[in-house]
Amino acid sequence: MNHLPMLETKRLVLRDISILDAPDMYEYATDYDIGPLAGWAPHRSIQETIGIIGMFLDSKKRGEPGVFAVVLKENNKMIGTIELYNYVPGFKAELGYALSKAYWGRGIIPEAAEAIINWGFVTLGLKRIEIATFVDNYRSKRVCEKLGFTEEGVARKGYLRYDGIIFDKVIYGMTDTEYFNKTKNLK
């Protein structure tokens, strides 16, 4: 998979991340309220952000679909990332996301995630999408609920964070059958 499709929602454009997104990403990735909740350390320099974007771009070489930049249409600002990772073609993937704190509470991630989930089930032919979040990340848990994912259980001591702290994580899942039944009922 060389290029991700460009996906549009009412307020957002989801497109391939690029090195040119580094200044916008660095702006939010330094925030201690964002990275640690997603399992990564706050960025310490723009060079670190550039390196991480490089890793995102390299993930395609390992067979991952890639990372989408979440771009706000109103100002063309990159305000977050969203991706399907731990991808097994035709079977499953995990959904991950991060968003600038300035845009929390506006329904941005659910809006972006709906487009990615549709792409995963319809275009990639996935049978299952999972989301894992720390048990105390209430905002992310709320996103899972809004999206219609089912809480499947807690993996006790299931996540080793960048700083060596071990956390319990909650696993949410959605199958293709659930997704297509849900979307059929919305029509």
Which residues fall in each region the model found?
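Acyl-donor (CoA/ACP) binding surface of acyl/acetyltransferases
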Residues: 1-35, 67, 71-187
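Short loop/turn motifs at secondary-structure junctions and domain boundaries
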Residues: 59-63
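Conserved GNAT-fold acetyl-CoA-binding loop/helix
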Residues: 33-55, 66
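Juxtamembrane/interface motifs at transmembrane-helix termini
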Residues: 44-48, 56-58, 72, 100-101
